[in-house]
Amino acid sequence: MTEKSSQPLLRFTHRFRVERNKVRDRKVVWLILPTVLVLVTLFVGGFLFGILQSVGYFSVIADEEQKIGFDAYFAAFQNETVRAGIILTFRVAILSTVLSTVIALAISLMISRTKRFQSTLIAITQFNIPIPHVVAATGILLTFSQSGLVSRVTNHFGITDGTSDFPIITNDPFGYGIIMSYLWKEIPFMCVLILSALRGPVTNLDETAKTLGASYSYRLRKVILPYIFPAILSGTIIVFAFSFGSYEVPYLLGEPYPSTVSVVAYQLYTDRDLANRPTAMALATITSVVIGLLVYAYMKLTQQEGRK
């Protein structure tokens, strides 16, 4: 068979493969479409219902004088409990993000410079990643509360005089217990991101700079940190977004007052006074918008890094 006579056969084979791939892709789309539709309907429907209820639609109170507007949003920021919750939420989210990033960076740099037992150290830092946050929060509560394990040990050895003498770490107004729970979970997560970045092309750049006589501190400032900074920034956005919007950890380890915004929204929603429902929905909407903006920033950042 000559080359010219084989060209139609090659074109037919190529077209057949393309069409087969299209059919396979369509089949995959149709297979996952029911699940996607259910998830999108539940999420988008609930989100839209929350927005509508926050501006006065679908009110549970029959009030002919009730107007459609943003009164619930203004009422939320005028509420002292909400203002205290906003301060606590930002404090917990910022401290958790900064501390987890700094500690994870130090651990990752130490592991990357360790030649022996590196895989063992990585496994140790990542063993608690599959553990749910609610389990971690429960463990912190059972360990560091005034009637917890550490308090009983210190009382047994005479370090503290009874459970009331043990410092308040959980269910405190500052949020120490919440921050501890986030650190225990987010440090390994940040280590995964940073270690992955440290295993990339930055290794060759670091070796080249080392060969040219650059000190480790200089390489760290001029080579390593600038290269892994996008990975660190992406991780901090994720950690901050989760810490900002999480509910179960502040509910278990926080106080009734002040509480984080997510807990305050739940308290208002379940309050016997049904007039607080729009305010609760307004808080939930604001929290969702903030988290959505953070997710959008994360996606844009990853897209820019992908182009590079």
Q: Where are the regions that the model predicts?
A:
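Membrane-cytosol interface at the C-terminal ends of specific transmembrane alpha-helices
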Residues: 164-210
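Interhelical loop and adjacent transmembrane-helix boundary motif
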Residues: 22-27, 73-75, 244, 251-293, ...
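Transmembrane alpha-helix signature in integral membrane proteins
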Residues: 80-113, 123
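Transmembrane alpha-helical segments of polytopic membrane transport and secretion proteins
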Residues: 1-33, 116-118, 297-308
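C-terminal transmembrane helix and the adjacent membrane-cytosol boundary/short C-terminal tail
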Residues: 56, 195-205, 278-308
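Short membrane-interfacial helix/loop motifs at transmembrane-helix boundaries
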Residues: 43-80, 148, 157, 254-256, ...
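Membrane-interfacial helix termini and adjacent extracytoplasmic/periplasmic loops
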Residues: 138-183, 253-257
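Transmembrane alpha-helices
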Residues: 34-44, 127, 131, 180, ...
